[in-house]
Amino acid sequence: MPQMAPISWLTLFFIFSITLVIFNMKNYFCFFYNSNESCQNLNIKQYKLNWKW
């Protein structure tokens, strides 16, 4: 069974690492969250508390 040179392991490591980083960046920056619309549809009562110590 042939053995791989250390430079081949390094190139594989860098390729998979860069692929992982690009995939995570794509998923992180392509997700759009509309918080204003979802908060306006829900009628949540907010209570203000004045704490006096």
From Swiss-Prot:
List cellular component terms (GO).
mitochondrial membrane; proton-transporting ATP synthase complex
- Taxonomically, the superkingdom here is Eukaryota
UniProt KW keywords: ATP synthesis, CF(0), Hydrogen ion transport, Ion transport, Membrane, Mitochondrion, Transmembrane, Transmembrane helix, Transport
Any one biological process term the GO annotation gives: proton motive force-driven ATP synthesis
Which spans are transmembrane here? 4-24
Annotated membrane topology? Single-pass membrane protein
InterPro entries linked to this entry: ATP8_metazoa (IPR001421)
Task: State which gene encodes it.
Answer: mt:ATPase8
Q: What family does the Swiss-Prot or TrEMBL record give for this protein?
A: Belongs to the ATPase protein 8 family.
Q: What does this protein do?
A: Mitochondrial membrane ATP synthase (F(1)F(0) ATP synthase or Complex V) produces ATP from ADP in the presence of a proton gradient across the membrane which is generated by electron transport complexes of the respiratory chain. F-type ATPases consist of two structural domains, F(1) - containing the extramembraneous catalytic core and F(0) - containing the membrane proton channel, linked together by a central stalk and a peripheral stalk. During catalysis, ATP synthesis in the catalytic domain of F(1) is coupled via a rotary mechanism of the central stalk subunits to proton translocation.
What is the source species? Answer: Aedes albopictus (Asian tiger mosquito)
Its principal location?
Answer: mitochondrion
Please list the GO terms describing molecular function: proton transmembrane transporter activity
Query: Where located?
Result: Mitochondrion membrane
The protein's name in its UniProt record: ATP synthase protein 8
